[in-house]
Amino acid sequence: LESPIGTNPLHPKVVQSPAMRLFDSVKERIGTHEEFPHVGTTYRLTEHFQFWTKSVKLLMIAQPQQFIEIGEELAKEKGIAKGDWVKVSSKRGWIKAKAVVTKRMMPLQINGKTVHQIGIPLHGGWVNVSGEKQFIVNTLTPFVGDCNTQTPEYKTFLVNIEKA
């Protein structure tokens, strides 16, 4: 749905999949690479089982808090250090979490442009078992799906990141 370079090098006349299901209410909430230059990607952690994390005390002990993974190069560029609170935003909303600066999130070279990835684990819900406010990652994700299966696309989307 959203392109970190604003185009599709393999098919320049088509940026978005013509086979996706795009609801009218979503059309004005599509991010651009100028406003949201980084790619957010969601994933689960070993300690998580679906969304049980927020209500099972043992899982909250193992993984107590939402975090964001960013690469060393992007962290340096943004002045973000390990443990800093960061705000990650998309055209649809924003979340706050602690930053984890890592070598795992390396920048990509796409059509001659450096594109940074931001890892955003799916974590808990609005309030965890200890009563702390949490943020829902799906606040950032687009509401679009595959035209045949209606499976939503929550995996990648455009974001920006800044110190909170």
What does each model-found stretch correspond to?
Residues L1-S55:
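Long, low-complexity segments enriched in small/aliphatic residues
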